[in-house]
Design a protein with these regions (language model features):
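Processing junctions and N-termini across compartments
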Residues: 43-44, 223
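Acidic/His-rich structured neighborhood in mature extracellular/periplasmic domains
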Residues: 51, 65-70, 75-78, 87-203
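A cross-kingdom marker for long, charged
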Residues: 31-38, 45-63, 238-267
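Hydrophobic membrane-insertion alpha-helices, especially the h-region
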Residues: 2-15
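Ser/Thr-rich, Pro/Gly/Ala-heavy low-complexity intrinsically disordered linkers and tails
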Residues: 16-39
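Surface-exposed helix-capping loop/turn segments at secondary-structure junctions
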Residues: 24, 105-108, 195-196, 241-242, ...
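Metalloprotease/metallohydrolase-associated module, dominated by Zn2+-dependent proteases
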Residues: 18, 140-161, 171, 175, ...
Length: 267
């Protein structure tokens, strides 16, 4: 997610990466309606999202992580990694988040097969400081990333990152203490794990929601990917710091999206 006023290239990047702005209340320009991402196996030897390639004929091998990540914890087949300055409590929250999202479904199996993993960034780390994403500075510049507090869904590389402070509920975190991992996992689920009919249904519901005047100047209006991810955030937690835009709110505000998410994730 990005703040309003960014250049078109940055808006497009936000749509592609599933980035989250430092302020959840900031509106964002609509991003492009990109082609459906195909859930394919990533290159397990790639160390950054710019150099990754896909070879679906190659037998799957164990993913190799950068040596910086001294913490590695597997949860439901999905690996959580973190650097040395990340408190174990933050990794615990990431684990609880994953277990909650996948408690009523088996979507984690598809993500695990794709090699998806979660990065918990250190408190003072920005996106470009992480081994996987540093290469994006040349591609997108630094300005875009000053507005980003979480990122996911590089099409060739199912990886998401959030800051440890936000997982711990610390208001000094990039997302002001909101556990934005629900949003970022929503991107991974949407791009890699949902069935095609549900994927296309989300596009139709997004269009219907905009026609009905929903999500005016809210980040969910950016594109159908952010619509799904923001819905996921509300379904499991809340979109806002006050906790008001939660599952109950979603059920009444956008019942069609609520029912789709309930069918995908379970109760």
């Amino acid at each position: 997610m990005v703040a309003a006023g960014l250049v078109a290239g940055a808006a497009a990047a936000a749509a592609w990466f599933g980035a989250v702005p430092a302020s959840l209340d900031d509106p964002a320009p609509a991003g492009p309606d990109l082609a459906t991402p195909v859930a394919q196996l990533p290159d397990d030897t790639a160390t950054d999202v710019c150099g990754s390639t896909i070879d679906v004929t190659r037998p799957r091998t164990e993913r190799t992580f950068d040596a910086f990540y001294t913490t590695r914890r597997e949860v439901l087949g999905i690996t959580i990694v973190a650097g040395p300055d990340v408190e174990s409590a933050a990794v615990d929250v990431a684990e609880v988040t994953l277990r909650r999202v996948f408690a009523g479904n088996d979507l984690e199996d598809r993500l695990a097969e794709a090699g998806a993993y979660i990065i918990v960034a250190e408190p003072d780390q920005g996106v470009l400081d992480l081994p996987e994403f540093g290469c994006l500075e040349d591609e997108l510049g630094t300005r875009f990333f000053t507005h980003v507090c979480g990122i996911a869904d590089r099409a060739e590389n199912p990886v998401a990152t959030v800051n440890a402070l936000d997982l711990l509920g610390d208001r000094s975190g990039p997302c002001n203490g909101v556990n934005i991992l629900y949003h970022e996992v929503g991107h991974l689920v949407h791009g890699w794990a949902v069935d095609p009919p549900d994927y296309f249904e989300s596009r139709l519901l997004y269009s219907d929601a905009l026609k009905a005047g929903l999500y005016d100047r809210q980040y969910a209006s950016t594109n159908f990917r952010e619509y799904f991810a923001e819905g996921t955030q509300a379904y499991f937690d809340a979109q806002d710091r006050e906790g008001e835009r939660n599952r109950t709110w979603l059920e009444h505000y956008d019942p069609a999206l609520y029912e789709l998410l309930r069918a995908i994730y379970g109760d």
